[in-house]
Amino acid sequence: PGLYWLKDAGRAVGLPVTTEVATTQHVEQALKAGIDVLWIGARTTVNPFSVQPIADALKGVDIPVMVKNPINPDIELWLGALERLNAAGVNKLAAIHRGFTAYKKSRFRNKPNWKIPIELRRRVPSLPIICDPSHIAGTRKLVPEVSQTALDLTFDGLMVESHIDPDVALSDAKQQLKPAELGRML
């Protein structure tokens, strides 16, 4: 029922809704619920044996699909996932830059490593690239800074986490903005 609630919420505010899919069952459920956009998460992108069944499940389906970068800084894995989806006939593709695992303590939760999405843009100029500043920042106070850097680098959009009361969010509470904070940032 969660996907239907999400779809109802989107209708109530007049916005399209998106959700992450990691398996063919997720794809089937999202399509059945009428979800508008799908995304493949960073931990799925790293595994071609996970991406291929998702690509196969999307054959003949006209839905936008966004692909997050893999957790490790490997542009070939990212490109490989995008190419598998494209080969399956998914034409509405976008990439999401969410940063890379930081093996050393850093001010960011995930290292931005901006040169990788810049190289992706060089290789596939027509591919929209969205930035997920929430996952890069890891803390809400850094989200505006990361967002501005992404826009300065001509990213095509932002995927920002927002919650009415982030401190009680069930996941990633530290990186979520309150709606008013999101409004000010935008």
What is each model feature region?
Residues 1, 164-173:
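Glycine-rich, proline-tolerant flexible connector loops at the mouths of alpha/beta enzymes
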Residues 1-19, 54-64, 114-129, 175-186:
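Alpha-helix-loop-beta-strand connector modules within alpha/beta enzyme cores
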Residues 1-39, 47-50:
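N-terminal active-site wall of soluble small-molecule enzyme domains
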Residues 20, 41, 132-134:
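Conserved acidic functional residues
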Residues 25-27, 46-47, 74-75, 166-167:
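Short secondary-structure capping/turn micro-motifs that flank functional sites
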Residues 39-44, 67-70:
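Short beta->alpha connector loops at strand-helix junctions that form conserved
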Residues 50-165:
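Catalytic alpha/beta core domains of metabolic enzymes, predominantly
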Residues 143, 171-178:
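Short glycine/threonine-rich loop-to-helix capping motif typified by GTGT followed
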